[in-house]
Amino acid sequence: STGILAGGYRALYELTDVEKDEAGIQVLGDINVTADNTVPQDNSNINPEDYVNTGIEFIDVLPIDGYVSEKDQSDIELAASANFDWSLPSDFMRTTKDFWETSSHHITVGGTITPTGKILRVGIIEPSGIRRCIYATGNFSYNFPLDKTGFYCVYAINDNSEVVNLTGHYGTY
């Protein structure tokens, strides 16, 4: 029976992907060791209010069919950093212009969301088109590590039934 138990622990260990985080150790996609609960890898079956400003990142798989999508029209193109001041109507997605970034670098996105208590999906779009996001409200900041080289952009999606404002900044390093 000891061998079976040891084998079970070994199997669990091999299935666990541990990432050190400033807030402690967190297991992505398996069990969150610090909170003793499951952390989903994508946002298909979550309540966004449970993950606001937690620093937990998701693959953003929610459909955006029917959403209006608009690329920022500022003069800044291919910039490694930029400020933005966006007013996002309901069911709306806004993106920055594309910029080139190298794998092993990071994109940090931060800002302020108003009105108070409104939640936005804020994230990056990878060169392959995969969206990665956090759920944010109020003042927030998040660092997205990169594992691909190519064109990226920053985005925000408003799933609320009213206009939500996002004033912020992104930077790469």
Describe the role of every protein-language-model region.
Residues 132-137:
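Short beta-strand segments within Ig-like beta-sandwich modules, predominantly Fibronectin type-III
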Residues 1-89:
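N-terminal prepro-regions of secreted/extracellular proteins
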Residues 117-130:
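Short, surface-exposed beta-strand/strand-loop-strand elements in extracellular ectodomains
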Residues 105-107, 145-160:
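Noncatalytic modules at the cell exterior or secretory-pathway interfaces
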Residues 88-103:
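Non-catalytic, beta-strand-enriched accessory regions in extracellular/secretory proteins
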Residues 138-144:
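Short strand-edge motifs at loop-to-beta-strand transitions and within beta-strands
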Residues 104, 114-119, 160-161:
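Short proline/glycine-enriched turn/loop motifs at strand-loop junctions of beta-rich domains
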Residues 120, 160-173:
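Edge beta-strands of jelly-roll/beta-sandwich modules across compartments, strongly enriched
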